[in-house]
UniProtKB/Swiss-Prot annotation:
It comes from the Bacteria. Belongs to the fluoride channel Fluc/FEX (TC 1.A.43) family. Na(+) binds at G87, T90. The keyword Transport applies. It catalyses: fluoride(in) = fluoride(out). Keywords: Cell inner membrane, Cell membrane, Ion channel, Ion transport, Membrane, Metal-binding, Sodium, Transmembrane, Transmembrane helix, Transport. The chain crosses the membrane at residues 17-37, 42-62, 80-100, 109-129. It is found in: Cell inner membrane. This is Fluoride-specific ion channel FluC 1.
Length: 142
């Protein structure tokens, strides 16, 4: 049986704390952005925007701090941003509920447009984040 040392347990606890803190910040940010962009019934622009910007952030940060990235980030900082913040900020569950409500409310074409535009927007956002960070990574360091 391999028992983790107290240092390993401390590192694990700190990583959990970083992810938790990122989740809190991401969740609060999502709530505030959702309030600011709430357009009422119909097409859920706030959730589309939140998931698109979250995809942009994770694509940018993953590339910026990846093996070929310009920025060296500690594992706990990557987990804070990518797992914690982006996980707390983006919301597939809200997307699912909004899509269900649109279908259930008889707005089938709006629901289909929402699903299609969301998937395209998220993928384009991750790609744009990656491209932006890749270009930044190639800049001369000062």
């Amino acid at each position: 049986m391999n028992v983790p040392s107290s240092a390993e347990r401390w590192r694990s606890a700190m990583l959990y704390a970083w992810v938790s803190a990122g989740s809190v910040v991401g969740g609060l940010t999502r709530y505030l952005v959702g309030l600011a962009l709430d357009t009422g019934p119909g097409f859920p622009f706030a959730t589309l925007f939140i998931n698109a910007t979250g995809s942009l952030i994770i694509g940018f940060y993953a590339t910026l701090t990846g093996p070929d990235g310009r920025m060296l980030a500690r594992p706990e900082h990557r987990q804070f941003v990518m797992t914690g913040f982006c996980g707390g900020y983006t919301t597939f569950s809200a997307f699912s509920l909004e899509t269900f409500r649109l279908f259930h409310g008889g707005m089938k074409y709006i629901a289909l447009a929402y699903v299609a535009s969301s998937v395209v927007c998220w993928l384009v956002s991750v790609w744009l984040g990656h491209i932006m960070a890749s270009r930044y990574n190639r800049l001369k360091r000062s």
